[in-house]
Amino acid sequence: METTMKKKGRVKATITSQKEEEGTVRKGPWTMEEDFILFNYILNHGEGLWNSVAKASGLKRTGKSCRLRWLNYLRPDVRRGNITEEEQLLIIQLHAKLGNRWSKIAKHLPGRTDNEIKNFWRTKIQRHMKVSSENMMNHQHHCSGNSQSSGMTTQGSSGKAIDTAESFSQAKTTTFNVVEQQSNENYWNVEDLWPVHLLNGDHHVI
């Protein structure tokens, strides 16, 4: 009976300890200080196991959070700035072949992350394609109604079809011209980290 009580006590203590540990995990946006700590730690020790990185570096973040922060923002080879028109066309071509296999698509765009490409596709390209498709359907319906009400000739109808094709071509061109300004003001770029790192003259984590 006493042994059972001790076991229950140990289990309860373990659960309590886990809950307390989970309660100390930071969530939300990363600070510049956290970026600097993670950057310097990986610079000196390498990536390794991310759960170990989170604990050894002293960051109160999960291993997954550290991994995503490094891969998507702090890696020296991460490409900065907006996605170019050339990259946009390549994404469209690759998506037609590979579908939503973002990691495979990212391999063809050096410096771009799979998460960045996925977000660009869903928020920019996919949205504009949907709007363009709806506009095209409305345009065709409008042209069809005008054709029936005015008793257009075959030759006139052919002319309208050509106009419709031209309009669709213009809409298609407009659809993919969706590269917009993307703000990186909330993040500390690696370009900001390096000067600080060099001025300190110290490779150790602060």
UniProtKB/Swiss-Prot annotation:
Annotated Low complexity bias: 144-159
SMART domains for the chain: SANT
Tissues and organs where the protein is expressed, per its UniProt entry: Expressed specifically in flowers.
GO cellular component, as recorded: nucleus
Major place of residence: nucleus
Alphabetic keyword roster: Activator, DNA-binding, Nucleus, Repeat, Transcription, Transcription regulation
Subcellular location, record wording: Nucleus
Disruption phenotype annotation: No visible phenotype. Myb21 and myb57 double mutant has an intermediate sterility phenotype and petals that grew to a final height parallel to the pistil. Myb24 and myb57 double mutant has petals that grew to a final height parallel to the pistil. Myb21, myb24 and myb57 triple mutant has a strongly reduced fertility and an arrested growth of the petals that never grew out of the sepals.
Domain HTH myb-type: start-end pairs: 22-74, 75-129
Region feature (Disordered): 1-20, 138-162
UniProt key word Nucleus: yes
Short name of any one Pfam family annotated for the protein: Myb_DNA-binding
BP GO annotations: gibberellic acid mediated signaling pathway; jasmonic acid mediated signaling pathway; stamen development; stamen filament development
InterPro entries cross-referenced by the UniProt entry: EOBI/EOBII-like_plant, Homeodomain-like_sf, Myb_dom, SANT/Myb
MF-aspect GO terms: DNA-binding transcription factor activity; promoter-specific chromatin binding; transcription cis-regulatory region binding
Positions with biased composition (Basic residues): 1-11
Residues within the DNA-binding region(s): 50-74, 102-125
Biological function: Transcription factor acting redundantly with MYB21 and MYB24 to control stamen filament elongation in the late developed flowers. Repressed at the transcript levels by DELLA proteins.
Designated name of the protein: Transcription factor MYB57
Originating organism: Arabidopsis thaliana
Lineage: Eukaryota, Viridiplantae, Streptophyta, Embryophyta, Tracheophyta
